[in-house]
């Protein structure tokens, strides 16, 4: 006999679906509007969602090509967007790899080893992570100004300095990976030790292969945080050619000349690396996000 849903349940289902559709529309509308602005003629922030006439001039400029207008004028690319994009990917990729390496080894020590002050160190790391980076900008500038005198490749106006600054944000990732490690039975490592494995071999050959989901999550979160970060990068980087895309895009919004179309094209380009990284690692993402929430 067919089951008949009561009217109240149908109403709840309808309201739920309607709410989800509104939520999806609220997320998609800004993205579609940015794409529409990048395809309009001129540099205007207002207009319809569907352009009257599609123009690729902003995309050509963003990709480094000059644009020739009907009256014979030639507009060269105002900024090196592709170079900024490469700088962003390079800094974010190296930062993410470094954070995964540091967080993993640190979390292993907190999850498997006993030493005095372990709980205090864990809490202290988390407390320091709660302070916004803006509060440390003056100290960071002074620190990297002095470091650059002795180690030039991590001084001011260097990508090494930006990466070195980003590597300090590992506290939350240490907690996340530590929680994941504690869900893995330590008897596996004990069995490896009985077979003659050293602690490093047990960590590398037993624990790490089982921890790929959480490592993928930490890599993605670190990559996104680094590629979209502005305050620290804008403080440490001075030359236009050394900018990341997040910092360089501010050049389009000069109070005397707002290049909204060019800005929109660069903004869409900036989302491509994040999307690719997410698509490549999505099969591990859900497992990793739901597995590290263990009380430690």
UniProtKB/Swiss-Prot annotation:
UniProt cross-references to SUPFAM superfamilies, sorted A to Z: MetI-like
Domain ABC transmembrane type-1 residues, every copy: 85-281
GO cellular component: plasma membrane
GO-annotated molecular function: ABC-type maltose transporter activity
Membrane topology recorded in Swiss-Prot or TrEMBL: Multi-pass membrane protein
Keywords in alphabetical order: Cell inner membrane, Cell membrane, Membrane, Sugar transport, Transmembrane, Transmembrane helix, Transport
Entry's transmembrane regions: 13-35, 89-111, 124-143, 153-175, 205-227, 258-280
Cytoplasmic topological intervals: 1-12, 112-123, 176-204, 281-296
Keyword Transmembrane applies: yes
Subcellular location: Cell inner membrane
Stretches of the chain found on the membrane's Periplasmic side: 36-88, 144-152, 228-257
GO BP: any one term: maltodextrin transmembrane transport
Task of the protein: Part of the ABC transporter complex MalEFGK involved in maltose/maltodextrin import. Probably responsible for the translocation of the substrate across the membrane.
Family indicated by similarity: Belongs to the binding-protein-dependent transport system permease family. MalFG subfamily.
Subunit organization: The complex is composed of two ATP-binding proteins (MalK), two transmembrane proteins (MalG and MalF) and a solute-binding protein (MalE).
Protein name per UniProt: Maltose/maltodextrin transport system permease protein MalG
Species, as recorded: Salmonella typhi
Gene that encodes it: malG
């Amino acid at each position: 006999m067919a089951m008949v849903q009561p009217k109240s349940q149908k109403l709840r289902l309808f309201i739920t679906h309607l709410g989800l559709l509104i939520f999806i529309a609220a997320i998609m509308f800004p993205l579609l509007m940015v794409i529409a602005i990048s395809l309009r003629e001129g540099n205007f922030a207002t207009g319809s969602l569907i352009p009257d006439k599609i123009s690729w001039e902003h995309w050509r400029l963003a990709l480094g090509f000059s644009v020739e207008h009907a009256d014979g004028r030639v507009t060269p690319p105002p900024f090196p967007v592709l170079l900024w994009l490469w700088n962003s990917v390079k800094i974010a990729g190296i930062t993410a790899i470094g954070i995964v390496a540091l967080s993993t080894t640190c979390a292993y020590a907190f999850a498997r080893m006993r030493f005095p002050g372990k709980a205090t160190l864990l809490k202290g790391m988390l407390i320091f992570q709660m302070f916004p980076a803006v509060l440390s900008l003056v100290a960071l500038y002074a620190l990297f100004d002095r470091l650059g005198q002795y180690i030039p490749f991590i001084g001011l106006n260097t990508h090494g300095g930006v990466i070195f600054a980003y590597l300090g944000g590992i506290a939350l990732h240490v907690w996340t990976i530590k929680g994941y490690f504690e869900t893995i039975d330590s008897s596996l490592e004990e069995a490896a030790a009985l077979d003659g494995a050293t602690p490093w071999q047990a960590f590398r050959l037993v624990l790490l292969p089982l921890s790929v989901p959480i490592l993928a999550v930490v890599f993605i979160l670190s990559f996104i945080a680094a590629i979209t970060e502005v305050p620290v990068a804008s403080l440490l980087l001075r030359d236009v050619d050394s900018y990341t895309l997040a910092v360089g895009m501010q050049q389009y919004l000069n109070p005397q000349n707002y290049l909204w179309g060019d800005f929109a094209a660069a903004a869409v380009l900036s989302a491509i690396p994040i999307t690719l990284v997410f698509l490549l690692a999505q099969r591990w993402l859900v497992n990793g996000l739901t597995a590290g929430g263990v009380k430690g």
